[in-house]
């Protein structure tokens, strides 16, 4: 039993296996007690939520252990990279709430990497191979059978040096030759079988222009860049587990070149791998996401149906909700398929705390309060956010003519229908209790107007408002509202596990992933909200104004519903 003065004991969150490894390194005094991580995106596309998991780890452990996390753009393939991607990646990381130490580029080290490659040739660790890509691949062998040595494997060092320099000239022919590390063609690890470390590319680089015609491969540039920068922990996803011995081997060579063989195991980056993020109904391949954009299946990288950070931001996800979701699923050594519903639940929980409550009617039908004075209006006070008193209130105009949701009225209803029906009372939120008296139909039998009478002493805050009425409806004044377009999104794909389906991805697209609803009505306060402001359309879901929205043409994106309707739909 605790006394009044005692503080409750906070439940200590268990460490991830990555944090355990880092704490063990700190306890041993490795790297002088420093913690330095990096997030190394390739600037060939927009970041998606899978990258967000890596970002949360890289920046999170650096912050937790008083270290630093830098950004390094892996810009070793100029055919796919540009500055647009660089700028958007930086914007996404900043939006997620992280601050980097420095910004680096693999291209910063092209001179050092070239020097290292020359050293490897001179010391018999690399050679120029003039075979075709198909021949090289065929000679690699299989995991159970050794590879076959290239006929160029033992070519004279001076010849390889001369050809390597030739690779880096405008006259060289792409695909005519590559530089390969001379390692072990019989190694069970396929990555060790004389990997290609340089290839010819004549596309101008977005930073270095036409200075280079030969570029390092990822495996050759990545570990060395970590080493040049002083990275202590190189954290990546599980597909890089078989790359780790090669990562370490190249750093061994680099330390040997620098004469650091006495302390070859000290002051070097340690590669640690965790499980990547996989989500149901979600494509994570940047190559395929780019194809969706280029082929017009989506409006762009920031289409709200895309799993990109920019798409989620535009849809109305908060950075906190994404971070909370990633924190909830954790980091393991085993790949798993996470339910999209878990992400949406995290979004829903977070937006409940921060979204401003407003009224909007998506499928409107006219409600006339027949005994309300013609031409009279009242300003009703509406709480902006019951979860946060500091958000204050706003006013919503009440009048004789209102819009309500068509589904909130039934001419003949069962006893379990607690919304509007003839002869029954309902409460209009923030306003009065009204009793439905009838409805008007057109020649086709469609209801075009509902009539009701209000109780003048039942206004919110009055004594008459306290009587029990089961149904509460939202509404907007027909004369004090704005017309809007609402975009409702569904899963982009119809299959939960895309990786398990052999069909082409475009065959799996959901033709109903976007539903556009025109002629909706929103209250004036909602019409004034801008992109970036989180809204709850009461009784409907969470929304945000789209960048397409203008004063003359309001557009709102549905972020997520108030409840998980997808689970019910698929039962």
Name these PLM-found stretches:
Residues 71, 75-77, 83-84, 105, ...:
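Active-site cores that bind ATP or allylic diphosphates and position pyrophosphate for catalysis
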Residues 40-43, 72-80, 102-111, 134, ...:
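Conserved short loop/turn motifs at secondary-structure junctions
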Residues 29, 58, 89, 120, ...:
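Residue-level signal for inorganic ion chemistry
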Residues 13-90, 205-237:
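N-terminal catalytic cores of NTP/NDP-binding nucleotidyl/phosphoryl-transfer enzymes
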Residues 85-111, 116-119, 124-127:
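A glycine-rich helix N-cap at a beta->alpha junction
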Residues 266-346:
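Long, charged, mostly alpha-helical binding arms that flank functional sites
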Residues 325-571:
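Substrate/cofactor-recognition hotspot
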Residues 1-7:
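N-terminal acidic, proline/glycine-rich, low-complexity intrinsically disordered segments
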């Amino acid at each position: 039993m605790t006394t009044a003065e005692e503080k409750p004991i906070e439940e200590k969150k268990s460490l991830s296996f990555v944090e355990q490894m880092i704490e063990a390194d700190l306890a041993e005094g490795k790297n002088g007690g420093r913690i330095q991580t990096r997030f190394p995106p390739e600037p060939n596309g927009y970041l998606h939520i899978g990258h967000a998991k890596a970002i949360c780890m890289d920046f999170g452990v650096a912050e937790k252990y008083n270290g630093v996390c830098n950004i390094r753009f892996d810009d070793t393939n100029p055919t796919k990279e540009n500055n647009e991607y660089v700028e958007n990646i930086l914007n996404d990381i900043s939006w997620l709430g992280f601050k980097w130490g420095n910004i680096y580029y693999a291209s910063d080290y092209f001179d050092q990497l070239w020097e290292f490659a020359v050293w490897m040739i001179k010391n018999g660790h690399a050679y120029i191979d003039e075979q075709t890509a198909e021949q090289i691949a065929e000679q690699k062998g299989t995991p159970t059978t050794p590879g076959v040595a290239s006929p160029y494997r033992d070519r004279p060092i001076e010849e390889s040096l001369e050809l390597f320099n030739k690779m880096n000239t405008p006259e060289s022919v792409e695909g005519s030759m590559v530089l390969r590390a001379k390692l072990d063609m019989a190694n069970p690890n396929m990555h060790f079988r004389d990997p290609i470390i340089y290839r010819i590319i004549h596309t101008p680089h977005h930073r270095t222009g036409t200075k280079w015609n030969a570029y390092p491969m990822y495996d050759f540039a990545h570990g060395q860049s970590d080493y040049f920068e002083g990275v202590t922990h190189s954290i990546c996803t599980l597909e890089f587990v078989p790359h780790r011995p090669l990562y370490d081997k190249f750093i061994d060579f680099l330390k040997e070149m620098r004469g650091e063989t006495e302390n070859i195991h000290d002051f070097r980056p340690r590669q640690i791998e965790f499980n990547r993020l996989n989500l149901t109904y979600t494509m994570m391949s940047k190559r395929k996401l780019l194809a969706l954009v280029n082929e017009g299946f989506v409006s762009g990288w920031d289409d709200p149906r895309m799993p990109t950070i920019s798409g989620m931001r535009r849809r109305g996800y908060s950075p906190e909700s994404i971070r909370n979701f990633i924190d909830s699923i954790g980091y393991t050594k085993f790949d798993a398929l996470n339910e999209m519903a878990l992400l949406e639940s995290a979004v829903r929980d977070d937006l409940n705390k921060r979204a401003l409550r407003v009224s909007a009617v998506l499928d409107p039908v006219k409600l006339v309060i027949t005994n309300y004075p013609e031409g009279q209006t009242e300003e009703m006070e509406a709480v902006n956010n019951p979860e946060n008193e500091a958000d204050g209130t706003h006013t919503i105009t009440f009048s004789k003519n209102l819009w309500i949701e068509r589904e909130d009225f039934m001419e003949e209803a069962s006893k379990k229908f607690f919304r509007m029906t003839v002869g029954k009372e309902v409460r209009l939120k923030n306003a009065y209790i009204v009793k439905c008296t009838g409805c008007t139909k057109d020649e086709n039998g469609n209801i075009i107007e509902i009539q009701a009478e209000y109780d003048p002493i039942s206004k919110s805050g009055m004594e008459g408002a306290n009587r029990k009425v089961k149904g509460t409806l939202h509404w907007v004044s027909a004369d004090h509202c704005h017309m809007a377009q609402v975009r409702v999104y569904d899963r982009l794909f119809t299959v939960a596990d895309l990786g398990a389906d052999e069909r082409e991805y475009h065959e799996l697209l959901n033709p109903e992933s976007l539903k556009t609803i025109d002629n909706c009505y929103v209250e004036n306060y909602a019409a004034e909200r801008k992109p970036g402001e989180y809204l709850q359309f009461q009784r409907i879901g969470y929304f945000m104004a789209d960048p397409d929205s203008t004063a003359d043409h309001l557009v709102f994106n549905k972020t997520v519903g108030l409840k998980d309707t997808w689970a019910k739909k698929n039962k």
